[in-house]
Each structure stands twice: as structure tokens, then as C-alpha cells.
Curated annotation (Swiss-Prot):
Pfam families: Pardaxin. Monomer. In aqueous solution exists as a tetramer. GO terms for cellular component: extracellular region; membrane; other organism cell membrane. Belongs to the pardaxin family. One of its GO terms (molecular function) is toxin activity. Exhibits unusual shark repellent and surfactant properties. Forms voltage-dependent, ion-permeable channels in membranes. At high concentration causes cell membrane lysis. Keywords: Ion transport, Membrane, Secreted, Target cell membrane, Target membrane, Toxin, Transmembrane, Transport. Consists of a C-terminal hydrophilic region and a predominantly hydrophobic remainder. InterPro entries: Pardaxin. This is Pardaxin P-4. It comes from Pardachirus marmoratus.
Amino acid sequence: GFFALIPKIISSPLFKTLLSAVGSALSSSGGQE
């Protein structure tokens, strides 16, 4: 099912790029508070 796809999604380069982008956005918005 869907959960079998999760490791593939997590290991994909696109996911890592998205995750780092979200992480930097969160840290920058959190740092402004």
C-alpha cells in the first residue's frame, strides 16, 4: 500500500530538496520571532 512507498519517497533526491527547503523556511521564520 501507501506505506510501502514511504521509504522510496524519503530516499528520493526531490524529497530531500523539499525537506531542506521547508526546514530552512521554518528556521528562518522561527528566528524572526
